[in-house]
Amino acid sequence: EFREDEQITFDGKKNEIINGYPDWVYEEEFGFNKGFYWSPKGDRIAYYKFDESKVKEFQMAMYGGLYPDQNTFKYPKAGEANSVTSVYVYDLNAMTSKRVDAGKKKDQYIPRIKWTKNNDKLCIMRMNRQQNQLDFLVTDLSTSQPFELKADVFFTEKSDTYLEVGDDLTFLADGSSFIVLSQRDGF
């Protein structure tokens, strides 16, 4: 079934709110260039929302013409404010978005979101700013929560130093098992 193009967010604003596309940190540090993902049945879209209104602006001269242009963009430096990141799920049938509660901390990363094999379950990876703890959360969209979806931690990876985030999370067909590359040692 084909439908007309449909706008699903209305609050995007240059250098303030980004929907469905990564901000600078997520593109450069977590290596992705897309911020939305279709559910297995294609009836929902999970997407990132970045509020970069508190991130300081950076100006860069862009050379290439007779005179350089100035490009201004949000660029957080070490210790400065990052974008506040949240995840939403848009339901194409209900034509509504719900925010996923990925924790109350504002100073955290959500380096990956991924649908499980179950169309009603979305996995969110949540990482602390020190990047030494990675929590795997799941939210169940079949619940009838009106505006916000609760997410629960089902696995945590910790390190004394640093954790690398990859795309190696695989959900198995049984709906409850998964495989992930762990950086733990001592086995």
Model segments located where?
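Predominantly five- to eight-bladed beta-propeller fold
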Residues: 5-36, 44-99, 145
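A conserved hydrophobic secondary-structure block that centers on an alpha-helix together
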Residues: 1-15, 105-112
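Short loop/turn motifs that cap or connect beta-strands within the blades
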Residues: 9-12, 100-104, 155-159
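Short glycine-/Asp-/Thr-/Trp-enriched loop segments that recur within the blades
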Residues: 15-32, 104-110, 159-166
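Long hydrophobic segments that form regular secondary structure
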Residues: 91-128, 142
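Beta-rich catalytic cores
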Residues: 32-34, 83, 109-111, 132, ...
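Beta-strand C-termini and the immediately following turn/loop, strongest in propeller blades
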Residues: 1, 34-37, 46-52, 77-81, ...
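Hydrophobic beta-strand positions in blades of beta-propellers and related beta-sheet-rich domains
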Residues: 1, 5, 45, 87-89, ...
